[in-house]
Amino acid sequence: YSQILINSRPVVSALSGVYGLEQIPVNMIERVEVVRGGGSALFGANAVGGTINIITKDPINNSFQVSSTMSNMNGKVWEQYMGANASLVSKDNTYGIALYQSYRNRNPYDADGDGFSELGKLNMNTFGLRTYYRPTQFSRISLEYHTTNEFRRGGNKFDLQPHETDITEQTKHVINSGGLSYDLFWKEYKHKLSFYSSIQHTDRNSYYGAQQDANAYGKTKDLTWVAGGMYVGNFEKVLFSPATFTAGLEYQNNSLHDVMTGYHRDMK
């Protein structure tokens, strides 16, 4: 019952949230904002338990960074991670762009030797960018995009096809997400008017089955988008004290198409 937000936009659908934060690479995150409780239900029915807001990195200065780590679990399984970040900002701060890329690979881990994995096989590639342009001193246009290509599998008999095993959970995700926003400030930055739109498309091929079930293959397409506008005004005195006034309008849409041919299931 927690909603994941990307830069305050609820574009992470219930389907994308199945594996949740594990599909978001660390090197794209600037900070994480957590709101607990039903007060966050303004973002929708998925948020009655709270929200997790992922704020991605903004270009601040010219920089480049590459990192790589290797980890081992009980001397059995290796996990590899590689990440790269780069940012470029103009001298007058008129425009800037931040790029990131990450790669993660993990072999299946069987902790108790029963032949079934406690941690599944994982292979994930992610690329993204965030850029801005300031047409004037009091306006800003921002654009962001990121894509994730992920394969994961858990169960047993990893050398066989999923329908030849005792039990397998296997998914392949291709996720594309982007957003565009325009911010207009008044002088002294006491008032702000924003227009924004964000979209995310998920394409998933899956297998959830046991006992050599050849019918358990599925294919799912999911599209989520949101668009809206917001005004924020700061006033030095309203009646007897300073005040902030916020107003906005937002529209959200989520469409899902799930097909399992073996079970003659076609849901929209």
Label each PLM-derived region with a short phrase.
Residues 13-15, 28-30, 41-53, 57-112, ...:
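Outer-membrane beta-barrel translocator/receptor signature
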Residues 82-88, 129-133, 180-184, 227-233:
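Residues on the lipid-exposed face of transmembrane beta-strands in outer-membrane beta-barrel proteins
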Residues 106-126, 132-134, 138-193, 199-223:
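Flexible loop and strand-edge segments within Gram-negative outer membrane beta-barrel domains
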Residues 171-174, 199, 203-268:
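Outer-membrane beta-barrel transmembrane domain signature of Gram-negative proteins
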